[in-house]
Amino acid sequence: MSDTDFDTALVASAFRVAAEQGWHKVNAVKAARAAELSVAEARARFPAIASILLKFGRMADQAALHHVPSEGTVRDRLFDLLMQRFDFLQAHRAGVLALLRALPGDPLTAMLLTCSTRRSMRWMLQAAGVDATGPRGDVQTHGLLAVWLWAVRAWERDKSDDLSSTMAAVDSGLQRAESIASWLDGSRPAPPAAKA
């Protein structure tokens, strides 16, 4: 078994364990045993639960970036990339939902995920053709992170087969982010001042 296959199998097993027992019951040993993988290899490759989470995030990014759209507007490309990332999450839905339920009581994991997801959003921006570097890139990255987190809330409640509610949330979030960015750039007039 290649390293990639091992990692994929262990991470998938970890999220199955989360779905069955809750996120706080997940560890690399339990995931390895459930998938009949080497515990020694699991220790070498996943020394902490954070390693599993970070690997899962990279796998989600790779799934999104595997088919980078080359046509359409930046907004169109970002929509496709984010939805491809949601397709990956959907394949592990029960485990991801277990993780999300655990976050309010686990601020360190929540912080880790926020930082990791912010890096992921920078990748999505750059893949869509946005120069997300420097202070402006930081603002754009935080903006896309806000869109993603907004859409995750919709995805949590979305029971449709085609993720229609999630798609609507991504689309409306990107539209709002685009409007704010245009206003900040001065390419759109500021909203009219309220009359006294």
Predicted features by range, described:
Residues 55, 66-101, 105, 115:
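Hydrophobic alpha-helical connector segments
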